[in-house]
Amino acid sequence: VGSEMCIRDRYKYSGTGSSGTIAHGLGSAGAIPKMIIVKRLDSADNWCIYHYNIGNTRRIRFNSNDYYGTGSGYWNNTSPTSSVFSIGNSSEVNSSGGSYIAICFCEIAGYSKISSYVGNGSSSKPPFIMTGHKPSFILMKRWDAADHWYIINNKTIGYNDANYGVYPNLDNNEYTGNVYIPRIYSNGFTLNTTDPQMNASGGQYMYMSIGQTLVGSNNIPSTAYWYG
């Protein structure tokens, strides 16, 4: 387990075609995976992602802008534990003889956050997403409707409002417009837009945020703070 990667561990496994469990190493840190990314290596198939806010009956595909799919074939309708995660019989996660890689993520307080938020459709008073750290990397996706994945970082330019992003499910170049640019603070971020990709009224969004190197007495660099 590497704290520098927000607490993630990687595993290769062979599919059996029957539901079962895969051991992970995050339990050594007392952690339960909140996000799992699975990809078949030996044959063309979709990326398959578990996110605990979406639940153990659903999955999101990394290579698509689709909303969630439902079925026991993905996670066997079972949430991860501190020692294993479950898989069903879908070819995306468990075809007999298939070769797979799984990347499991959990949280470290003050450094990473895996959670969700609900949009309010307001650009003047958007939702503030509390992460407990200053985000350096944010992966997000609307999961209740079709829309693109989006990755934001605060290093390309490094100041508000120029935290540009990319679409991991597309081959587009970096987006440098002003519609999808968040404001990053020492304890979270806001999405000052009404665009449904990030802030539809009532829209359901999942995200994973990773912070910068822990520094200071409170382990959070303070460059700006959101007071609401």
Language model: regions and residue ranges:
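Short, small-residue-biased leader/transition segments that mark boundaries at the very start
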Residues: 1-7
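GGW-centered surface loops in extracellular recognition modules
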Residues: 8-52, 103, 130, 214-228
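Surface-exposed ligand/attachment interfaces on beta-rich extracellular proteins
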Residues: 12-30, 89-94, 116-132, 197
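Beta-rich globular "head" domains
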Residues: 26-43, 127-156, 209
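Acidic glycine-/aspartate-rich tracts in secreted/extracellular proteins
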Residues: 40-45, 54-57, 67, 108-110, ...
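Contiguous ligand/interfacial binding patches
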Residues: 51-98, 153-201
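Extended Gly/Ser/Thr-rich low-complexity repeat segments
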Residues: 93-107, 198-215
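Extracellular low-complexity, Gly/Ser/Thr-rich intrinsically disordered linkers
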Residues: 130-145, 183-212
